[in-house]
Design a protein with these regions (language model features):
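N-terminal, active-site-proximal structural segment of metallo-dependent hydrolase catalytic domains
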Residues: 15-104, 108, 114-126, 194, ...
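Metal-dependent phosphoester-hydrolase catalytic domains
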Residues: 16, 201-212, 220-343
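A long, amphipathic alpha-helix that forms part
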Residues: 186-208
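Beta-strand-turn-beta hairpins that frame and shape the catalytic cleft
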Residues: 16-24, 33, 134-136, 155-178, ...
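Active-site-proximal beta-strand/loop segments in catalytic clefts of secreted hydrolases
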Residues: 27-30, 89-92, 115-119, 131-132, ...
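Structured beta-strand-rich core segments of catalytic domains in phosphoester-bond hydrolases
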Residues: 85, 91-171
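Extracytoplasmic/secreted cell-surface and envelope-processing proteins
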Residues: 34-35, 95-98, 122-125, 183-186, ...
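Bacterial Sec-dependent N-terminal signal peptides
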Residues: 1-19
């Protein structure tokens, strides 16, 4: 069954009504590289002779670890089903994705992927994993990051992987992002936010009923100007206007102090999934006749957290301080759950 009977205590609805539930996730893969050089890319650190001594053993373990975590995403709510879609960042190429979806936990569910090779100098791209039993892709486009200043004409970074398709019988769009790094400065992430907003607005102009989700590692918090002002991702459902988006992660960071990556002992929440207004129940409504947002989750399984040492309590990353930890990622995964009443 790809549905869940949601009882009174969850949604305060008729306990005998059936609702289909869909998990949509995002997970930064933290340098999911193979062991081979890609021409024109600065991937030398992730070669057997590179600084990380990235050999077959480490690569094989990385694939196994990431597949485990990806397959577990969403299973708290949807056991044995997991997420319908998962956006990825920091994947090197299609070879890596072929190897990833061939891992038993993902292969058992038949996950496929969407990927377009991008211009990032390190060779890291975004991708979208999807379960073809739940999501049917229709269009795919990598919208480029367009530098705005003459001095940045040679600035090559990740574009915005834009995928449309059907989920739960409805037209949806997913924009998977990995915005410029913190080292670049906030200006470049605000440029990215403006460009993503333009993509989102264009989709809604062309298809007014389409439901749009922007997801990714934004390298900014929900409270940052790029997210809160430029993308206009609001903290409260009832604050969201027709040109805005809803950011369910805002209060998780601002009020609860929880996040997806740790820096100098404090949490940031760079990994976000934000939603268009037509995915919300506003002003106290409980109308699930079409796909609507239900709740969100930062995935914190024990095996994803460093249990000892200097980095205790932080995400268990692949390497730290030059030491291979056989971990997962320096980021935690995130999931939003969407609900639709079964007809």
């Amino acid at each position: 069954m790809l549905s869940l009977l949601l009882v009174l205590g969850l949604l305060r609805l008729n306990a005998q009504t059936n609702y289909s539930v869909y998990g949509v996730g995002f997970y930064n893969q933290e340098n999911l590289f193979d062991t081979c050089h890609d021409k024109g890319k600065n991937d030398y650190d992730f070669l057997p002779t590179g600084s990380y001594k990235w050999d077959k053993l480490k690569y094989t373990n990385k694939l196994r670890n990431m597949a485990r975590a990806l397959a577990d995403m969403g299973t708290d709510v949807l056991p044995k089903v997991g997420c319908a879609m998962i956006g990825l960042s920091e994947v090197e190429n299609a070879r890596v994705l072929d190897a990833l979806v061939a891992q038993p936990p993902l292969a058992a569910r038949g996950y496929r992927y969407i990927h377009v090779e991008g211009p990032d100098r390190r060779g890291i791209d975004c991708a979208l994993l999807y379960n073809p039993q739940l999501f049917t892709p229709q269009t795919v486009k990598l919208v480029p990051y367009v530098p705005q200043l003459p001095k940045d004409s040679a600035f090559h970074t990740r574009g915005y992987l834009t995928v449309t398709g059907t989920l739960g019988g409805e037209h949806v769009a997913v924009i998977v992002c990995h915005w410029p790094s913190r080292y670049s400065g906030s200006y470049y992430r605000e440029v990215a936010a403006a460009q993503v907003k333009a993509v989102k607005d264009s989709l809604l102009r062309q298809h007014p009923a389409i439901k749009v989700m922007v997801m990714g590692d934004m390298n900014d918090d929900p409270t940052s100007r790029s997210m809160a002002k430029v993308l206009s991702a609001k903290a409260e459902v009832d604050e969201v206007g027709k040109d805005d988006m809803y950011n369910p992660w805002y209060n998780i960071l601002a009020k609860q102090g929880r996040g997806t990556l740790m820096y100098q002992g404090g949490w940031n929440l760079f990994d976000q999934i934000v939603l268009s207004p037509n995915m919300l129940n506003q002003n106290g409504k409980r109308d699930f006749s079409s796909l609507k947002y239900w709740k969100c989750q930062i995935v914190r399984y024990d095996y994803l957290i460093q249990s000892t040492g200097k980095y205790k309590g932080a995400p268990k990353r692949t390497t730290a301080g030059g030491v291979w930890l056989n971990g997962y990622s320096d980021h935690l995964p995130v999931v939003v759950y969407l609900v639709k009443k079964q007809s």
